[in-house]
Amino acid sequence: MFKCGGVEVQYRNFGNTGIKVSALGFGTMRLPMFPNSNTIDQEKSIELIRYAIDNGVNYIDTAYSYQDGQAEIVTGKALKNGYRSKVYLASKAPVWEYNNEYDFDRILAEQMRRMNVNQIDFYMLHSLDANFWDNKVLKYNVLEHLYKAKRDGRIRYIGFSFNDDFDMFKWICDYWEHWDFCQIHLNYIDEEYQAGLRGLEYAKKKGMAVNIMEPLRSGYLANVPKSTQIVFDEICAKPVEIAMQYLWDKEGVSCVLSDMGSFEHINQNLEYAKVSSIGMLSGKRIMAIKKAQQTYINSRMIHCNGCYKCNCCPQHVMIPRNLEAINKIGIHNSVKIAKEFYDGSVALVGGSATDCTNCKWCESICPQHINISHWMHKLPELIK
């Protein structure tokens, strides 16, 4: 337990590694950017990362692909001046970039140069699904290279992040005996989605640590519809508080990752993390979550989790924000809210759905297999 300014961060077992990590981890997928720009505000981002570390967060999660590679660079800078020794550093290998057996070592070396480190504590194969598993991991003997990197000290622990169904998750877990941990998409809306609760339980039984990504479902669970907010108000709880506690309540969860873009966001999550514990949910809160689940099930239009893997459109369509605009129609039961979001976050800065040429490149890499081109052409009609 770490205390700073009255804040106490709880630590949890990281599978069978013997390591304890903070219940709250700092994700770098959405570091703050300059207005109307794709460039990270490095000074602000470094301040945020170091502030979280100073207040007890000891798990920093980044990836080769986050924010076009900028996230790893900024993370490395944030860990200078003694901060590297205070944290466990996690990053991910972009398996989709592998085209031969040499690419693993080349890309890992590039990542280590970006972050200016000689070792990565937790290294994951990023976004595994059946396609990447067969056509990248197995085809190019990636597991052999991964284990060699562990043996020679470039990485300490081996894992994977996941974007497919439970059967594929189980297959990957069972295929290789050297997995130390995994990272899955889980929140109170998506209990049966991808690996889901079954995946959490299965990994726990195998002694693997389990990190959670998308605890707030890309912000959807932070800005709940009025009907859900009323339910939470009745038990004097905030939406983010409920979403995080839902996960910390579960024994198999090692660390809940949050992309924190402001000091306010960090402080809020720290306050929730300091009271986190297994089995913490009361009966009233469990019932409130069940009601919230039903509300979302009845209102969603597209099962997009905002992973941003499609945000490299050849026509520069800002696909995630366009999809978010569509989902706001159902979640908030309001075309007005959806149009205001679209006008302010898409039309104003460029990347409109109307620029879609139906090339379907985005659909080939979407982990959720969304018919994106269909929705891009439908969006203007939905919000007019």
What is the role of each PLM region?
Residues 2-87, 145, 151:
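N-terminal binding-site loop/beta-alpha segment at the start of enzyme catalytic domains
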Residues 59-65, 156-160, 183-184, 255-257:
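Short catalytic-loop micro-motif centered on adjacent basic/acidic residues
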Residues 53, 58, 77, 174-175, ...:
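Structured C-terminal cap/extension of enzyme domains
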Residues 98-216, 224-227, 234-235, 249:
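Glycine/proline-rich, positively charged
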Residues 14, 26, 45, 52, ...:
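Conserved, mostly hydrophobic/aromatic
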Residues 29-34, 96, 128-131:
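A short, flexible beta-alpha/helix-coil linker loop
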Residues 85-97, 123-126:
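A short, structured active-site edge motif that brings together acidic residues
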Residues 10, 44-48, 71-78, 107-111, ...:
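A general structural detector for well-ordered alpha-helical segments in enzyme core domains, enriched
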